[in-house]
Amino acid sequence: MGRFPEAEERLLNKKICMRCNARNAIRATRCRKCGYSALRVKSKESKGA
């Protein structure tokens, strides 16, 4: 993507809550804001065209 590898790791190595879209740690099992357990890994590719 053109960023430094350290920045890529910090920005993209996250989990996203499917209910409230909060960013969570990669090792999280529940959302830190709402407690929901359905977390997805953040997309590594941008959605833009």
Curated annotation (Swiss-Prot):
Pfam families: Ribosomal_L40e. SMART domains: Ribosomal_L40e (SM01377). PANTHER family: 50S RIBOSOMAL PROTEIN L40E, LARGE RIBOSOMAL SUBUNIT PROTEIN EL40. It comes from Methanosarcina barkeri (strain Fusaro / DSM 804). GO terms for biological process: translation. It comes from the Archaea. Disulfide bonds: none annotated. This is Large ribosomal subunit protein eL40. One of its GO terms (molecular function) is structural constituent of ribosome. Keywords: Ribonucleoprotein, Ribosomal protein. HAMAP family: Ribosomal_eL40. The keyword Ribonucleoprotein applies. InterPro entries: Ribosomal_eL40_arc (IPR023657), Ribosomal_eL40_dom (IPR001975), Ribosomal_eL40_sf (IPR038587), Ribosomal_zn-bd (IPR011332). Belongs to the eukaryotic ribosomal protein eL40 family. GO terms for cellular component: ribonucleoprotein complex; ribosome. The lineage of its organism: Archaea, Methanobacteriati, Methanobacteriota, Stenosarchaea group, Methanomicrobia.
